[in-house]
């Protein structure tokens, strides 16, 4: 079942998404100067492929210290991930707005385990999700494994 589930999730995460969304994801990744492993795009805008309203992203970053934020926010992330912030991205005449959640892959993995008291991660990522940006093939494979774990936990 796991291989089949992984295959289904890999196909789902590879769905086409609007170019401005991919560009926004790449910009988020650039903010952490190489420490981002993946940017996930999910939520109602993924279902509709609309650029209106607030886009939803999860940024997986190797080390939370690499993400540009204040020291107190970094400490808070270690205690209660993810950190969530609002970002805007102007591309041509189009202004995109997004809610951006940030956590490490290990925090994501811990949140998708059966023993986790926080159900928000595995519940959220049991729904459609696209990988809007990945650093490389290894990061993509690891991200798909994390998403498979979320679905298996649900």
Segment roles from a protein language model:
Residues 1-35, 40, 46-52, 62-154:
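Catalytic core of pol beta-like nucleotidyltransferases
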Residues 58-60:
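Short hydrophobic/aromatic beta-strand micro-patches
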